[in-house]
């Protein structure tokens, strides 16, 4: 059994949130590659060295603390949404680091830690782990741009002096990611632990509708080619057409809307928006894509608009490894807390890592189900329970694999 230091873990976790502190509660502003995110990554690096692990970083900015022999890999990410919470990703990195450190101190099995870069999608979808796993070619990733038009290939050069070289996934025997649930199910129940059974698949593309910019006061409604009206009609029709295709856990979101010229006295002539959908079944994701594209075409024809769909990004649904599920379930039983098997509706780095090794995830409750906001929080007792489950599961898994 790996004996973790809960006080040391909590102190480090709180110290990490000082990097990019929003000034609103415990929230953070730490998107990938901004100065506060880089400072946080350097600080994590100092903690990795302090723990007696070998510090490494690949060209994409993924940061590793490697134990002799590699062993079991734990971790997540420390970048945040533009308005993010203090635990999303950071919890998995600091919990993983504490378990790795405690394992070394106690002569336990080899445990390593990873802090992936750009999980939150400044440039794509779980970009750092996607490149590390080979799911996303590095040269393709380098062409991705953020909202300001900066390319990943350009921006990541800020970490060039920290890069030590490629990190071989083959040295690790498995991966566990501890994370907040980011939803209401654990918080509204007696269960304190969620053992993840699978991670949903995701599809994401950028859509542009082009109409005709004109005077808002003198253009009759019947002559308008108003792209905002087109977007509104698309949303309404899409919800109706999805009704007999989706299941209760299916979700879809229109976001990241950019209206041009975005002025009160001009009929808008162009709108670009993101279209994202998630489900646990690949076939349903494909059916939803067909409906989305057909609905866009129908709206464009009805309203005299042009439609353009950008490249499709996304990941397939992924089942978690049975051996890791069993280890986490046994650890939850040992802690004598209520727990449940549950899917993950959010995307995580574990999806990419599963391409190379067995992957598992464990959730702790999110207060009021809130995440991706400054109000994101989890009771400290639940954080410590999750840490102990993670440590116990690591011991159990390594006992049967080493």
Question: Predicted regions: what is each one?
Answer:
Residues 22-67:
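A non-catalytic alpha/beta surface segment that caps or lines the substrate-entry region
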Residues 51, 59, 63-87:
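Catalytic-core environment of secreted peptidases
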Residues 56-58, 110, 166-167, 218, ...:
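Flexible, glycine/charged-enriched surface loops at secondary-structure junctions
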Residues 15-22, 75-76, 338-389, 397:
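Zn-dependent metallopeptidase/amidohydrolase metal-coordination segment
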Residues 2-34, 117:
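N-terminal capping segment at the start of a domain
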Residues 29-33, 253-262, 274-276, 280, ...:
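A short beta-alpha structural unit
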Residues 3-6, 18-19, 151-197, 236-243, ...:
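Active-site-adjacent substrate-binding region
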Residues 79, 118-282:
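Midchain, well-structured core segments that form catalytic/ion-binding scaffolds
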